[in-house]
């Protein structure tokens, strides 16, 4: 995770839904910066620049904030996206220091093809991990290559990158490999079978 994600921010002095709407209309994202026992700071981020960083580095992106000339590293903790129009409505940012370990939820990506006749179900899309803020992985890969029916992959059995430890319950079921349901015959096939039986 790079710390080169420079993002300019300005301090917001207006609060409430009306102020947040005005911030978004101006092309910005209302955000709150908190952590390290400091008072929460209400910020305004450039929407396009922030969205570009999230697209490249994921929802746990570390930001190098320039708050009106003052530099501050921050971890993106949560992002609220409008369910229909898909713009960013709000963001929560956590103050971090170099070398500091943080806990974050990261996406689990399933790769590979399980054995024939199986169906892979992903029971958990994220797991919670602990790592240095600047070294948080964007995602954790889990391979199901040639996995047989009955294979279960728990959070505790996932190989994590060096320097990353599991914060989730080790027994959390992440991937389950089950038997694929039998294909139902098409209506035409059923009719043909019935006709064949009648002819006999």
UniProtKB/Swiss-Prot annotation:
Matching Gene3D superfamilies: Ribosomal protein L25, beta domain (2.170.120.20), Ribosomal Protein L25, Chain P (2.40.240.10)
InterPro entries: Rbsml_bL25/Gln-tRNA_synth_N (IPR020056), Ribosomal_bL25/Gln-tRNA_synth (IPR011035), Ribosomal_bL25_b-dom (IPR020057), Ribosomal_bL25_C (IPR037121), Ribosomal_bL25_long (IPR001021), Ribosomal_L25_dom (IPR029751), Ribosomal_uL5_bac-type (IPR020930)
Single GO MF descriptor: structural constituent of ribosome
Pfam families listed in its UniProt record: Ribosomal_L25p, Ribosomal_TL5_C
GO biological process terms, semicolon-separated: translation
SUPFAM superfamilies associated with the record: Ribosomal protein L25-like
Keywords: Ribonucleoprotein, Ribosomal protein, RNA-binding, rRNA-binding
One GO location term (cellular component): cytosolic large ribosomal subunit
NCBIfam families: bL25_bact_ctc, PRK05618.2-1
Family: Belongs to the bacterial ribosomal protein bL25 family. CTC subfamily.
Subunit (UniProt): Part of the 50S ribosomal subunit; part of the 5S rRNA/L5/L18/L25 subcomplex. Contacts the 5S rRNA. Binds to the 5S rRNA independently of L5 and L18.
Function (record text): This is one of the proteins that binds to the 5S RNA in the ribosome where it forms part of the central protuberance.
Record's protein name: Large ribosomal subunit protein bL25
């Amino acid at each position: 995770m790079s710390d080169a994600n420079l993002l300019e921010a300005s301090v917001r002095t207006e609060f409430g839904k009306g102020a947040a709407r005005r911030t978004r209309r101006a092309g910005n994202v209302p955000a709150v910066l908190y952590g390290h026992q400091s008072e929460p700071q209400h910020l305004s981020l450039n929407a396009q620049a922030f969205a570009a960083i999230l697209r490249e580095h994921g929802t746990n992106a570390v930001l190098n904030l320039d708050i009106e000339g003052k530099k501050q590293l921050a971890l993106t903790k949560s992002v609220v996206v409008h369910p229909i129009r898909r713009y960013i409505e709000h963001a929560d940012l956590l103050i971090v220091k170099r070398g500091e370990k943080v806990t974050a939820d990261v996406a689990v990506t399933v790769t590979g093809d399980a054995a024939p006749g199986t169906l892979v179900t992903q029971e958990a899309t994220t797991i919670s991990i602990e790592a240095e803020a600047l070294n948080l992985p964007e995602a954790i890969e889990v391979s199901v290559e040639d996995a047989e029916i009955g294979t279960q992959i728990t959070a505790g059995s996932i190989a994590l990158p060096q320097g990353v430890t599991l914060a989730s319950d080790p027994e959390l079921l992440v991937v389950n490999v089950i038997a694929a349901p039998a294909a139902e015959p098409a209506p035409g096939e059923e009719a043909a079978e019935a006709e064949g039986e009648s002819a006999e």
